[in-house]
């Protein structure tokens, strides 16, 4: 008898714990990618998943905020786009805010309501735009003047000084073969002979 009571108590405790599992918004993606860089779509698609273990769980609304400042997004402010509340179950939405600028990081989050109309906010994610058109190209192509069938691999070196402390930098590399990048004599990244782009 005591065993049956203990089993019954354990069963109801498990159901109670399962019912208290918080709703979470996860798997935030831009163009189906996790925190991508170099997006060239002026209208990227943003998606997410709602994790809610309750029976009959459903998303009843969503609101997306996008901004260049992550703190604004944390506070629910989107100067680039605030979709406003949309009564919809959609979890894939096309960006519909101000025109995105090239080479810019945009932070975003989604706020959704569950089946009880309680709101849950996602963690902040981001996407970075790429060149977004040849008119923004400022780089100069470098090469050894040989075609791709020439045997020895070229080695390119460029010395320069920034004149100030570098907070972050990005190198865009397109190679007809493999490459490794070094800065100040130190290899960048943990890959070995990265392919093409």
Spans of features found by a protein language model:
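Pro/Thr/Ser/Gly-rich low-complexity, intrinsically disordered linker/stalk tracts
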Residues: 20-55, 126-133
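Short, conserved beta-strand segments of beta-strand-rich sandwich/propeller modules, principally
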Residues: 45, 105-109, 168-170
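Short beta-strand elements bearing conserved aromatic residues within extracellular beta-rich modules
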Residues: 46, 61-64, 179-181
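Recognizes extended acidic, P/S/T-rich segments that occur
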Residues: 50, 57-105, 111, 115-122, ...
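Beta-strand-rich ligand-recognition modules
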Residues: 95-99, 183-197
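Low-complexity, Pro/Ser/Thr- and charge-rich linker/hinge segments at domain boundaries
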Residues: 129-151
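Aromatic-lined ligand-binding clefts that engage carbohydrates, nucleic acids, or primary amines
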Residues: 160-163, 167-183
